[in-house]
Curated annotation (Swiss-Prot):
Family, per entry: Belongs to the bacterial CoaD family.
Name of the molecule in the record: Phosphopantetheine adenylyltransferase
Signal peptide boundaries: none
Pfam families, sorted: CTP_transf_like (PF01467)
A single cellular component GO annotation: cytoplasm
Organism: Finegoldia magna (strain ATCC 29328 / DSM 20472 / WAL 2508)
Binding site for substrate: S11, K43, T75, R89
EC number: 2.7.7.3
Gene: coaD
GO molecular function, one term: ATP binding
Residue numbers binding ATP: S11, F12, H19, G90, L91, R92, E100, Y125, A126, F127, L128, S129, S130, S131
Annotated GO biological process: coenzyme A biosynthetic process
Assembly and oligomerization: Homohexamer.
Length: 162
């Protein structure tokens, strides 16, 4: 497994500036950051898998060492498939740590070679989540400081179509 390749999985429904902070910081540390959009059949998404991938591609186009993927199934299996031995996760609060630690331990049980690294969110993004963006956007309020500027219109359009 390659130690310079990392995996950052998530639903990214939609990607936020908090996600981008984690991606950009990871891109400075590691040679290759693999952002993987999870197709979770148990979770109803606001944006299609294709829309989420497209928004992330737009948001990350300035980062030459970031690759975008989509997958269905277990993160540990996908990490192995693309040769990553490290998963990156962002932490906003203690509540994130509890759930992320559980997931990290479960992943380690499934693949002993897989490590999880936690990056603490920048304080200005500690409140930010995709669900907050969706709620604010659903009321037509300004989301321009919450998501990458080049996807604001994509998100607005989705809520105007409803």
């Amino acid at each position: 497994m390659n130690k310079t390749k990392v995996l950052y999985p998530g639903s990214f429904d939609p990607i936020t500036n908090g996600h981008m902070d984690i991606i950009e910081r990871s891109a400075k540390i590691f040679e290759e950051v693999n952002v993987a959009v999870v197709k979770n059949i148990q979770k109803k998404s606001t944006f299609t898998l294709e829309q989420r991938v497209e928004m992330i591609e737009k948001a990350c186009k300035h980062l030459s060492n970031v690759k975008i993927h989509q997958f269905e199934g277990l993160t540990v299996d996908f990490a192995k498939q693309i040769g990553c031995s490290t998963i990156i996760r962002g932490l906003r609060a203690v509540s994130d740590f509890e759930s992320e630690m559980q997931m990290s331990l479960a992943n380690k049980k499934l693949n002993d070679e897989l490590e999880t690294l936690f990056l603490v969110a920048d304080g200005k993004y500690a409140f930010l989540s995709s669900s907050i963006v969706r709620e604010i956007a659903s009321y037509g309020a300004d989301i321009s400081e919450l998501v990458p500027e080049n996807i604001v219109e994509d998100i607005k359009q989705r809520f105007n179509d409803k």
